[in-house]
Amino acid sequence: MIYFLLWMILPVVLSSSYALDIPEGIYWGHEWQLGYYKHPPFSSWVLYSFYKIFGYSGPYILSQMCIALTLVFVYLLGSKIVSKPKALYAAIFVLAIYYYTWPSIEFNHNVAQMPIWAGLIYIFYLILNHNRWSLWLIFGVVAGIGMLTKYTVVFLIFSIVLFSLLTPYRHLWLSAKPWVATLLALLVFSPHLWWLYQHDWLTFNYIQSRSESTDHHYNPLVAFKYLAAQVSNFLPLLIILLCNKSLYLNFNYLNKNDRNFLFFMGLFPGILLFIISLIAGINIKDMWASPMWSLVALILFSLIPESVFNQRQRGLIKGLWIWLSLITLVMASYLQFGGQIRHKPSRLDWPQQQISQKVQQQWYTMSQCPLDNITGDNWLAILAATKMDQMPSVMMSTSKSYSPWMTLSRLEQKGTFVLWEKGKKPEIPYLSELQKNQNLVIQQGEWSIAWDKVPNKAPLVIEWQAFIPKHCTQS
């Protein structure tokens, strides 16, 4: 509990800005769309809701809740397979897997998937053992929500289907239950499919454009880079078990069905990404696998003889305590001193509060109307928007299609505020039309903002331009 509280509080206290994925998700969720140009919508809806309820700390609370819920599902599954003490240890030792610690300071679609993966696996285990209608219906809803969170959940769904077909559980497909669950999952996912159709498959077009912009010569060696990253992710867990002489490969303590289930569901999805990368020679992002490994600790603890486990519990907890203390200390030090050590700000070191205050003060000295939207440099725009008292909409500079809630008519009626780093003005949708509009008053200027986290760095110089409807101008 103390660990989770620290990881909720320390980023709020020690960082001066959000990491990239947090303000991006918040501004998406602010618009309550059925989809966005990078991802499906569910994660952003939840993130924005926590931001509205809990304020600036909301994303950090949500992220740790996702990790904690993942641990709960691992415990529930483990308690069906091993003793309850072992299940508890297996659950808390998920925190000895790197992906479930450091990356969680940045809530994103990977973190959002973690409890969904663990929950789906647990529900599937219950289905295999009880085959009730209620379980299949819950599975369908959660699978649909998973697909609304990130498309990579399809790897888990594929693994579940494959496992059922390769084992005696294939008889389940002879009943109506899995087919109804499939239809229910598609029903939950269908609003996003309709949105994709209406927006010319925007998300897939974005993914394609990103892949075309990168060099993708066939290179099977990138698969081993991915594999090495995954193995290194388990090092804290493996080291703790080795130091306590608790790393065993004894498969006699599990019945065959449970053993097959654990190993397949716990390892195959991550290995599947390796196989795809090896065959296609494409670079799989390491973090795509982050929700896939929640059962690894349960697998390893299930192999420990009960007598050995009973003798080593205290040492195991001590090892975990050392690891969690160390990673928490490193996290806090990085947030507080990282920019000074590197002489370069990370995304967490930007003067978000000052940027936001400058925008608000500047706008309200010129306009009597609320600031409806902000645009310009994407990073600066989302930083400013997500720290304001009344959050405005954000319009991406990249393409009109990336911000379908913004139209020329809205901009002409409400105006806009544009900001960018000096000398780096991006191409901004509709800007040329706004500059010709006689009903808008155009003001511009420049700010110089110090880097509190990197005091020796030259100040951040921001240029801005405001388009204010004439009926809103201060007299």
Residue ranges and their predicted role:
Residues 90-96, 143, 147:
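Short helix- or helix-capping micro-motifs
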Residues 10-25, 34-49, 53-58, 65, ...:
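Extracytoplasmic catalytic/substrate-binding loops of multi-pass membrane glycan-assembly enzymes
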Residues 102-113:
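Short acidic/glycine- and proline-prone juxtamembrane loop motifs at membrane-interface regions
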Residues 281-282, 286, 311-370, 377-395, ...:
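Membrane-proximal, lumen/periplasm-facing interface regions of secretory-pathway glyco-
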Residues 157-258, 269-275, 279:
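Transmembrane-lumen/periplasm boundary regions of multi-pass, lipid-linked membrane glycan transferases
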Residues 120-135:
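Membrane-interface transmembrane helices that cradle and orient dolichyl/undecaprenyl
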Residues 57, 61-85, 118-123:
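Transmembrane-helix motifs of polytopic, lipid-linked glycan transferases
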Residues 31-32, 260, 267, 281-312, ...:
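Hydrophobic/aromatic-rich transmembrane helices and adjacent perimembrane loops
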